[in-house]
Regions:
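N-terminal secretory signal peptides and thylakoid transit peptides that target proteins
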Residues: 1-15
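N-terminal Rossmann-like dinucleotide-binding module
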Residues: 11-77, 155-158, 244
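Nucleotide donor/acceptor-binding cores
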Residues: 31-33, 147, 177
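Conserved SAM-binding strand-loop segment of SAM-dependent methyltransferases
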Residues: 81-86
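N-terminal Rossmann-like NAD(P) cofactor-binding module of classical short-chain dehydrogenase/reductase
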Residues: 99-100
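Beta-strand-loop-alpha-helix segment that lines the small-molecule cofactor/substrate pocket
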Residues: 104, 109-157, 171, 387
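Contiguous beta-strand/loop segments that form the cofactor/metal-binding neighborhood of enzyme cores
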Residues: 162-163, 172-175, 180, 187-223, ...
């Protein structure tokens, strides 16, 4: 069966998306949500373009320690936007209501908690933290505050992903014992655009990270160096493991094992190819395969139960009944349910954030679920770097070998 939009919403009824492309109580021109953007690399500029498509907000300030990027962001925000290199100037501005944080991972905790302390609502990219301890601190502080904090795991605000959750909850898959996740990218190192060092505050870029000399590969591809990011595990697996947590109603694995190597990009610290396996409560396991060698097939998840399989990615959802699949020699069945993505999940996710700023309700990707997803990624990286399986002690909140 091919689901159209009408049958989609019928199937997904009872699950609140928490998103609206236009709000009934949208604020007027003098009552808009005034937003500053801290860290204006490519992802942050993409988020800015999404915000410009949504009603009731205004981009009023941009901050980056590298002037050329700050000026690129200012072109998006508009000529009247304030331009600063020190993020604290945005947080000190009482006329700014909220901030978008698009910095490298190692800055996420500090700027997010500074923003919350300053009374700002926050949209911070994933992973929300650079370590498990950072994430735990963020949960404690943010949940004790009155601020709205949304994290960039946009699947939680994306229509066909919400339908996927409804299918899982319906029991149509039977007993789910295996979830396969994968994400393939294509990347190269070297041939970097020259950096104008007179326009970069490298010390401020490093911030809480260890002091070290400037290297262009660390500036441009910081995700793949342990001082600043967590490689393809925290960059990519975090999205999918958040979906696993959400769909399966779990918040942490029992244990993790991982292996990886730099087969193609020797310059990086973090491996360009990784496999990880995670054992979960509720008698199921999940795997992750990630590589930066080839982008063919991109990324997605497969939930396998004894009655059926759900395959989902950012373009579509497909449910397969398993009746014929167990007969030797038969081909895989045609999908019983097929839904193609009807929109942009980042756009609806940012709308959810704006709506929650107005209503003061909990956003779809709130700090606790964001921490749980990042924590599982950090656990997988701990196993990867240790070279053996590690266990998670959920009572003591610590990793055990």
């Amino acid at each position: 069966m091919i689901c159209n939009r009408r049958t989609f919403f019928a199937a997904a009824s009872g699950l609140a998306l928490g998103t609206r492309m236009a709000t009934a109580n949208a604020q007027g021109a003098n009552d808009r949500i005034r937003i500053g953007v801290i860290g204006t690399g490519g992802r942050a500029r993409g988020l800015m373009n999404h915000l410009k498509r949504l009603p009731g907000n205004e981009l009023v300030a941009v901050c980056d320690v590298y002037e050329p990027r700050m000026l690129q962001a200012a072109e998006i925000a508009g000529t009247t936007a304030t331009k600063v290199a020190d993020y604290r100037r945005i947080l000190d501005d009482r006329g700014i209501d909220a901030v978008v944080i698009g910095t490298p991972d190692h800055w996420h905790k500090t700027i997010t908690l500074d923003a919350v302390a300053g009374g700002k609502d926050v949209y911070v990219e994933k992973p929300v933290s650079h370590t498990i301890a950072e994430g735990a601190e963020m949960v404690k502080v943010i949940e004790a505050s009155k601020q709205i904090v949304q994290t960039g795991t946009q699947q939680r605000s994306w229509e066909h992903w919400v339908l996927g959750k409804a299918i899982i909850d319906s029991g149509r898959l039977g007993q789910i014992t295996f979830v396969q996740t994968y994400w393939y990218q294509h990347a190269r190192a070297g041939n970097y655009t020259p950096v104008d060092m007179d326009k970069l505050d490298w010390k401020r870029w490093l911030g809480p990270a260890a002091d070290q000399p400037f290297r262009p590969e660390r500036f441009y591809q910081w995700r793949h160096y342990w001082d600043f990011g967590g490689g393809c595990v925290t960059d990519l697996m975090t999205h999918w493991i958040d979906v696993v947590h959400w769909y399966m109603d779990v918040d942490a694995p029992l244990s993790a094992a991982a292996t990886g190597r730099n087969y193609n990009i020797k310059l990086w610290e973090a491996p360009d190819t990784v496999t990880a396996t995670l054992e979960f409560p509720k008698n199921f396991m999940a795997s992750y395969v990630g590589t930066y060698v080839s982008k063919v097939d991109d990324g997605g998840l497969e939930f396998r139960g004894d009655l059926g399989t759900l395959k989902i990615d950012r373009t579509r959802l497909a449910f397969y009944r398993d009746d014929a699949a167990n007969v030797p020699g038969t081909l895989a069945p045609e999908p019983e349910t097929l839904v193609r993505s009807s929109g942009d999940g980042t756009l609806t996710h940012m709308q959810n954030w704006l709506d929650c700023i107005r209503s003061r309700k909990t956003p779809n990707a709130h700090i606790r679920v964001a921490h749980q997803a990042a924590r599982t990624s950090h656990l997988a990286n701990a196993a990867l770097r240790a070279g053996h399986r590690v266990k998670w002690n959920s009572v003591a909140e610590r990793i055990e070998s």
